[in-house]
From Swiss-Prot:
GO terms for biological process: adenylate cyclase-inhibiting G protein-coupled receptor signaling pathway; adenylate cyclase-modulating G protein-coupled receptor signaling pathway; G protein-coupled serotonin receptor signaling pathway; negative regulation of insulin secretion. Guanine nucleotide-binding proteins (G proteins) are involved as modulators or transducers in various transmembrane signaling systems. It comes from the Eukaryota. One of its GO terms (cellular component) is cell body. This is Guanine nucleotide-binding protein G(z) subunit alpha. Residues 1-14 have a biased composition (Basic and acidic residues). PROSITE patterns: G_ALPHA. The keyword Hydrolase does not apply. G-proteins are composed of 3 units; alpha, beta and gamma. The alpha chain contains the guanine nucleotide binding site. Interacts with ADGRB2. Residues 197-206 are annotated as: G3 motif. GO terms for molecular function: adenylate cyclase inhibitor activity; G protein-coupled receptor binding; G protein-coupled serotonin receptor binding; G-protein beta/gamma-subunit complex binding; GTP binding; GTPase activity; metal ion binding. GTP binds at residues 40-47, 176-182, 201-205, 270-273, 327. Residues 1-26 are annotated as: Disordered.
Amino acid sequence: MGCRQSSEEKEAARRSRRIDRHLRSESQRQRREIKLLLLGTSNSGKSTIVKQMKIIHSGGFNLEACKEYKPLIIYNAIDSLTRIIRALAALKIDFHNPDRAYDAVQLFALTGPAESKGEITPELLGVMRRLWADPGAQACFGRSSEYHLEDNAAYYLNDLERIAAPDYIPTVEDILRSRDMTTGIVENKFTFKELTFKMVDVGGQRSERKKWIHCFEGVTAIIFCVELSGYDLKLYEDNQTSRMAESLRLFDSICNNNWFINTSLILFLNKKDLLSEKIRRIPLSVCFPEYKGQNTYEEAAVYIQRQFEDLNRNKETKEIYSHFTCATDTSNIQFVFDAVTDVIIQNNLKYIGLC
């Protein structure tokens, strides 16, 4: 009996040591795994950040992956032009050349088959080129803040010949500029600085935000993306709410949420290139009537940054790490993400008492 007890005790001790080793190993693994949650309103550039991580840390897009983006890019180009043409009547803008009215009819007749096949026929290419070149369409494009038009419209429409070529293969820049509405939860894993990152992107539309709660568990850091250039635009969902106001409300709810007391909060003030171009034409006061500064990129960008950072109600214990970004610029995102990773590592060490 005594021997049997001793044997059982030894086995129990061995089992306990195995469990302890497993727990230590699991604890170390969890410390090396960084869960990054990408949040922000629709059109803030979250999905482009995910693509950049694939380019920078996961080998990029091979030939087959590039080819898979062709139908989406064709759709983006066609959709942009059809939005412009539809907006002409609403904005009371006429074609400069009356013949373009027939081309507009042809555009709507030809787009369905083109989108389903993922290719632009020579006939459709001619129609699209003539419409896009018309001064009336260009005037309508210049007023795109008055209707919904993606940022990539001019990029694709200025390069229709290349995109419509039968042997067209999207470039990395084409892919970065492509736009597809994120629905559900998209995860991307990669390794950097001996850490395993799990980047989670969830849709920014109002209808998608109810899914965010499912991603909150175990979050190491949040990257909140802001569309700097959206200060004069309305939400796609209701065409009334200011995109910037919606972004500020959303950031307030995330920044001051009890879920994220010990979570690093990184603010990506994105689309700085578009803000730099737009601020020369449209004053920041259309969004912030109290703004009295110059309509320059430098002053406007800092003012917007302050609006977000001032929402932090726990400044003594919680720091916001802000970066101005251009999500389509790989070198910029690579530099910023390197700095972000260092902050995350330091904050993790502080949290576990090693710093």
